[in-house]
Amino acid sequence: MDFITIDLKERSYPIYFAYDSFDKLGEIVKKHVRSSKTFIITDFNVYPLYFEKLNESLKKSRFDVSYEVIPAGETSKTMEMAQRLLEKAYDSGLLRDSSVIALGGGVVGDIAGFVAATYMRGIDFVQIPTTLLAQVDSSVGGKVAVNLKKGKNIVGAFHQPKMVYIDAAVLNTLDKREILGGLAEIIKYGIIWDFDLFEYIENNLHEILDLKEDKLKHIVKKSCEIKGKIVSLDEKEENLRSILNFGHTIGHAIEALTGYEWYIHGEAVAIGMVYACKLALNLGYIDEKYFERIFSLIQRTGLPTDYEDLHKEDIIKAIKLDKKNRSSKINFVLPCGFGKVEVISVREEEILKVLK
């Protein structure tokens, strides 16, 4: 099975790439966890599609499986839900050598990882992402968290998985909106690190949106390689890793202000990238031609490029809660060339100029 390795010394782990191979998962997981006792966390959307396949494969490999199904969506990523899951883990008899398996999208991965990171001060964690967004972003890198009412991912930890399993066949069950949400993050990687990837998406957009297997595999694997490289260089987001937040400063603000209900994460990031580029254009970091190229690709995908019914003053307030803003400064990840970004301290009045 094809795989890459995320290099974190003694905590390195593989990302496996497969197609419709859930029957092999039990054998693979067994190689990477310490005991056969495991706790699957999934949601009501994913449960009828893949739970039985995973459960059967694990039981063939003699796993003792317990599980919990949670409501789909960002509103499940709360301290209250985490407590419920932690209590279920305890009631199910999980010990320090047990594991948690996340079967689902980014929300499931985030909250399952948070449970794994905090239960008995940290137990083994396995990621099986079932959305394009989770495959290329949240399943890689070890950031796990839950939301507070006033901000996204405020309570969390760094807890690396023991392995990640990416099955391209699951993308066939996603609706177009979910595919586009993941594509927003892939476009992000092209802007911040590898402009060849950006150009590949420009040149193959139609086939990507048609879910051509070879095109999807290329952009998913390339995205994981890019994020893996960045994470291996800066695991705890002390410097370089913060560039992964391109588009997320305004994106997270939009999500919080709309109660995580109006926009899915990738849509908010797409809007955030457009506004980060507008800010970079105003400040002279990029020219009009560069801005138009990025705006054009995002628009061609069908992703939103602007927000509705929000006040700029409220967006500023939400931005100030952003974890990237140390001290009183407002930090933005801004493009400054092809495949290159920088973290820039920006004055509040400059941000207000580009917000509508």
UniProtKB/Swiss-Prot annotation:
Catalytic activity reported: 7-phospho-2-dehydro-3-deoxy-D-arabino-heptonate = 3-dehydroquinate + phosphate
UniProt GO molecular function: 3-dehydroquinate synthase activity; metal ion binding; nucleotide binding
EC code(s) of this entry: 4.2.3.4
Chief place of localization: cytoplasm
Residues where Zn(2+) binds: 185, 248, 265
Compartment annotation: Cytoplasm
GO annotation (BP), single: aromatic amino acid family biosynthetic process
Record-linked SUPFAM superfamilies: Dehydroquinate synthase-like
GO cellular component: cytoplasm
Cofactor: Co(2+); Zn(2+); NAD(+)
Record pathway: Metabolic intermediate biosynthesis; chorismate biosynthesis; chorismate from D-erythrose 4-phosphate and phosphoenolpyruvate: step 2/7
UniProt: NAD(+) binding residues: 106-110, 130-131, 143, 152
Keywords tagged on the record: Amino-acid biosynthesis, Aromatic amino acid biosynthesis, Cobalt, Cytoplasm, Lyase, Metal-binding, NAD, Nucleotide-binding, Zinc
Keyword Nucleotide-binding set for record: yes
Function: Catalyzes the conversion of 3-deoxy-D-arabino-heptulosonate 7-phosphate (DAHP) to dehydroquinate (DHQ).
Family: Belongs to the sugar phosphate cyclases superfamily. Dehydroquinate synthase family.
Protein name (record): 3-dehydroquinate synthase
